[in-house]
Swiss-Prot record:
Source organism phylogeny: Eukaryota, Viridiplantae, Streptophyta, Embryophyta, Tracheophyta
Enzyme kind, highest EC tier: oxidoreductase
Matching PANTHER family: LIGHT-INDEPENDENT PROTOCHLOROPHYLLIDE REDUCTASE SUBUNIT B
One GO CC term, this protein: chloroplast
Protein name: Light-independent protochlorophyllide reductase subunit B
Pathway where it operates: Porphyrin-containing compound metabolism; chlorophyll biosynthesis (light-independent)
UniProt key word Amino-acid biosynthesis: no
Signal peptide (residue range): none
Gene expressing this chain: chlB
Quaternary structure note: Protochlorophyllide reductase is composed of three subunits; ChlL, ChlN and ChlB. Forms a heterotetramer of two ChlB and two ChlN subunits.
Cofactor: [4Fe-4S] cluster
Length: 48
């Protein structure tokens, strides 16, 4: 988060941190998806 803030990049969602099913609707609106661990979210990021 700090690195992205320092680069003046707005964070849309951090999943699963405090996320809900309702929040998931905004995920496709992102310009890009950052996946820090490919084992966990690569397929999801590719889908989005």
């Amino acid at each position: 988060r700090r690195l992205l803030r320092d680069l003046d990049i707005k964070i849309n969602q951090v999943i699963p941190e405090g996320g809900s099913v309702k929040d998931l609707k905004s995920l496709p609106k992102a310009w890009f998806t950052l996946v820090p661990y490919s084992e966990v979210g690569l397929m999801t990021a590719m889908y989005l």
